[in-house]
Structure formats: structure tokens, C-alpha cells
Amino acid sequence: MTARALHYVFKVANRAKTIDFYTKILEMKVLRHEEFDKGCEASCNGPYDERWSKTMIGYGSEDEHFVLELTYNYPIHKYELGNDYRAIVIDSDQLFDKISRIDHRKSGCGRLAVKDPDGHEFKIGKADHAPKVLRVQLNVGDLEKSKKYWNELLGMGIVEEKKTRVRLSFGEGQCELEIVQSGEKIDRKTGFGRIAFSLPGEKLQPLQDKIKSANGTIINELLTLKTPGKADVQVVILADPDAHEICFVGDEGFRDLSKIDDAAEKELREQIQKDDSEKWY
């Protein structure tokens, strides 16, 4: 499959604290921000049907960078993290030096680990280039079963394979997925995330058919999502053997939808100022 790694979705409970962490600590930029009056048809915001918002944040254009999607549900002000998400790996000398001067812990391979306000961990390593998201690490209950799903069913190439972990990618230079054998059953709790990829639009239906033939899990069958004032996007939502959610979108519509909005951070800050949901829920 000619797929492209796009982003990972986090549910966040406090937008003000979260945006400060990502912009001031990880030095990311707000790329676009969207507000919605009701829940997403493809459960983009989780199992909620109230008002919500989506903020894309990262180190550059979504055409060229793997970024993050921060989902905020107005009625929800706390999520419980499970053991499904492990970490996101970012390398940069500049960022490494900065993190070394603030509260952190040392992780494996010489990286420094920090957490966002909701507890999502990031591992920062040294590299002579601007900050870049290199890898998403997810825990799995059965490494062989997961490897077979991602490699054989979804077509991700194996980059490196070790006894307790496998690194996969849809192509050179793309953000990798690293699946890591967990010593316990995967419990995603309420703070579960979602990883997203794009495919040429005409390949989405064949992908869905392939998953059905293999008796794989389809959370949302192929549908078209509308964003007010922006491009429509086709999506199909899958789940791997550990129920990690996987979104595949039509690449053509998504490239149009995902253009950088220079006014996004200003709009987000204004929405944060107006948000009085804690008084109501």
C-alpha cells in the first residue's frame, strides 16, 4: 500500500496547560484549529456526542511532518490513561539540551523523558537537526500477532525486529510505528488514542474489504466527514488485535483539509478564554 503516516490523536483535559506544554516545552506550532458542535461520525473525539474541538500541532506542514491531534471534549475534564500508549520519540540536539535543564527522567538509549499535562510521555534524543517526530511506541499483548496484523494485513514494512519489539514503517523518512511486547493485558481505559495514515482515496474501499475478509475489526466503515468551510475527507476506522484505533483517510481530501492556518493559535487562545465548561459540567 502507498500509505503515509499522518498523526497521533490525544484526548486532552485542559487546553491551556496542554498548549503551553507543546508550544513552550516541545516547541511545536499550532497548525490548525477546528470547533465542532456535536460528536464526530467516525468517533474522532471518542465516544462523546457533545461539543468538542480539534487542534493540530507539530513541527511543520502536515504534508511533510508527522504531527499530533489534540482532541478536547468540553464536558470531559479528566481521562484515565491505560497501558496502551508507550511514548513518542523526538530527536533534536536543541530540544534535548532544553529538556535536560527542566524536570525529566532518563529513559533507555540515552533519551530524556517528559510528560504532557495528561501524562503522555515523550522521549527526547540527540540529533543534529531540527526537532522531528521519529516514532510512535505502542504496547501490545502478543507481539507476533500484532506484527502479522501491521505487516501482513496493513502492509507496513519491518524496519527492525528484536525479541520484544518491532519497528515498522510505510516508507523511508516517514514516522515509524514501534510495537512493544507488554508483560500484561492491554487496557486502554478512557484516555485511549488513535493513529492516522492516508491512502489514495480509491484504495480505501479495497482496504476495508481486505480487513473484512480477514475478520479484522472495523470500528467505522468507510464514510465521508465534513468540516465546516473545509474539504470533505473519506475515512475508515480500524482496530488492531489490541484495539489500538487506526484511521485511514483519503489522501487527496486530507491534503486540502490539512493546510496550515496562520490564525489557528489566535483562534484557539480565544476559544480557551471563552470556555466556561467547567462551570456547567
From Swiss-Prot:
Lineage top rank: taxon: Eukaryota
Domain VOC: 4-127, 132-251
SUPFAM superfamilies: Glyoxalase/Bleomycin resistance protein/Dihydroxybiphenyl dioxygenase (SSF54593)
Keyword flag Transmembrane: no
Keywords from the named record: Repeat
GO BP: any one term: determination of adult lifespan
InterPro entries assigned to the protein according to its UniProt record, in alphabetical order: GLOD4 (IPR043193), GLOD4_C (IPR043194), Glyas_Bleomycin-R_OHBP_Dase (IPR029068), Glyas_Fos-R_dOase_dom (IPR004360), VOC (IPR037523)
Intrachain S-S bonds: none
CDD domains for this protein: GLOD4_C (cd16357)
Statement: the UniProt record of this protein carries the keyword Ligase: no
Signal peptide from the UniProt entry: none
Annotated family: Belongs to the glyoxalase I family.
Function: Thought to act as a glyoxalase. May remove methylglyoxal from mitochondrial proteins. Has roles in reducing oxidative stress and increasing lifespan.
Protein name per Swiss-Prot or TrEMBL: Glyoxalase 1
Gene that this sequence comes from: glod-4
